[in-house]
Amino acid sequence: MKTVYLIHENRNWSEPLEDALNKIGVPYVDWYMVDRVINMATSPPGGIFYNRMSASAHSRGHRYCPELTTGLLAWLESNNRRVINGSSALRLELSKMVQYSTLREVGIKFPRTVAATNAKGILEAAQFLKYPIISKPNRAGKGLGVKLSYNENELKNYIHSIQLSIN
């Protein structure tokens, strides 16, 4: 039986999976990305790699885990390893713009969306939309930073009262 490598940064998510794998006798290795070293001068081990990296890792103090995992997945894929939720899945996870572009490609409708990178940009972007506006960080998690603003003053007050997302 092949070994499953669990790629993640959140033990709360991995523990139930580990329990289930133990229950059915599937061997696994915990690749906790918070303190992982990747020696790209070697070939990765054989097995199945299951990626559970989250774009909201920074909200748990794990700021660079998604970037490290991006490199890890490239290494695994370039070595023809079987990866579940590989680089294309992580690319979707890390970018609302990529998510919306993909939804558009497959014909799924979503609310009119404008992207911005800072407070000034958010206010400029709001000019292209009609109130009420829902603002949502690109990477936050658990609904953090999602806000409904009914007018420009509410939006201004909100964006000046928060720490903007990492991107």
Where are these regions (language model features)?
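Conserved N-proximal alpha/beta basic substrate-recognition cap immediately N-terminal to
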Residues: 9-112
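Active-site nucleotide/adenylate-binding loops and adjacent lid/helix of ATP-dependent enzymes
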Residues: 80, 88-167
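Extreme N-terminal starter segment of soluble prokaryotic enzymes
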Residues: 1-5
